[in-house]
Structure formats: structure tokens, C-alpha cells
């Protein structure tokens, strides 16, 4: 889903999902800046989440300094949001650079970076507290 505004400017819009988090990334030519919900990625407090978000950019190396990325993400917790952002960025970079080399690099590193993680929470069953836990049984 790429849109070419002119011969010089190329903008790619991509999305990623993880559990209940949904991220939409807009990638365009720039100097390597990354914003998550209009906040620079450097200000994200959770170090593990920040590392997850920056994984695709670290993998492609110097190519990351040629694009600016803006991501809007909502839903879920901070870690599933980080995973959704990572998926959206990776998909967008593959589409932006239109390179099989970048795609194979991401797939070799982690196949869920492009395809997403299919795991979901198991639904709650009737007659139970949650999906697996049952009511406490008393014998006396």
C-alpha cells in the first residue's frame, strides 16, 4: 500500500498487529528519526520495548539513516505495542526499499517480524474463572 506523491517523494504506509495492539507506520525519506505516538523513540522509558522497536533499524544498518518513521499505536500493553510497532516498521521498510535482500534478512533473523505472531489469548469458558481455572471444589 504505497503512495507516490511525486518522482522524488515516496511514502509507505504499513501496519502491524500483536494481540490487541495495532500499529500504523508511515515511512518517508528523511534522516533517520523515529516517533512513536508523536514522541521520539529515545524518550521511551522501557529499555526492552525500545530495543524491540529498533531491531529492524539495527538490522538494515546505514539504510535506516535514509528514512523517517512515524508510528501510531493503540491497544494492549507496552510490550505488545512494541511488538506491533516492530512488525509495522519491518513491513514498511521491506516495501519502501523494495528489496528481497532486506526481506530475507528480516526472515532469517525472526520470521515473526514480517508475518506477525499468531498466538492469541484463549477465551474464557462458562462455568470457570478463566480459560483454564475452575471453581474451587470442597469435599467437606
Swiss-Prot record:
MF GO annotations: RNA binding; structural constituent of ribosome
Domain of life, source organism: Archaea
GO cellular component terms listed in the entry, alphabetical order: cytosolic small ribosomal subunit
Q: Which InterPro entries match?
A: Ribosomal_Su5_D2-typ_SF (IPR020568), Ribosomal_uS9 (IPR000754), Ribosomal_uS9_archaeal (IPR019958), Ribosomal_uS9_CS (IPR020574), Ribsml_uS5_D2-typ_fold_subgr (IPR014721)
PROSITE patterns noted in UniProt: RIBOSOMAL_S9
List the keywords (alphabetical).
Answer: Ribonucleoprotein, Ribosomal protein
* Any one of the GO BP annotations: translation
Q: Which NCBIfam families match?
A: PRK00474.1, uS9_arch
**Protein family:** Belongs to the universal ribosomal protein uS9 family.
Please report the name of this protein according to its UniProt entry.
Small ribosomal subunit protein uS9
Q: What is the scientific name of the source organism?
A: Desulfurococcus amylolyticus (strain DSM 18924 / JCM 16383 / VKM B-2413 / 1221n)
Tell me the lineage of the source organism.
Answer: Archaea, Thermoproteota, Thermoprotei, Desulfurococcales, Desulfurococcaceae
Q: Which gene encodes it?
A: rps9
Amino acid at each position: 500500500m504505497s503512495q507516490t506523491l511525486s518522482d522524488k517523494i515516496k511514502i509507505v504506509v504499513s501496519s502491524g498487529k500483536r494481540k490487541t495492539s495495532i500499529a500504523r507506520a508511515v515511512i518517508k525519506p528523511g534522516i533517520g528519526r523515529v516517533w512513536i505516538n508523536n514522541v521520539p523513540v529515545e524518550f521511551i522509558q522501557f529499555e526492552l520495548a525500545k530495543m524491540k522497536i529498533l531491531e529492524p533499524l539495527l538490522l538494515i544498518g546505514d539504510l535506516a539513516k535514509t528514512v523517517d518513521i512515524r508510528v501510531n499505536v493503540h491497544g494492549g500493553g507496552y510490550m505488545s505495542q512494541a511488538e506491533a510497532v516492530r512488525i509495522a516498521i519491518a513491513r514498511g521498510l521491506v516495501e519502501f526499499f523494495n528489496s528481497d535482500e532486506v526481506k530475507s534478512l528480516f526472515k532469517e533473523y525472526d520470521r515473526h517480524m514480517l508475518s506477525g505472531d499468531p498466538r492469541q489469548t484463549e477465551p474464557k469458558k462458562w462455568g470457570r474463572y478463566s480459560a483454564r481455572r475452575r471453581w474451587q471444589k470442597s469435599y467437606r
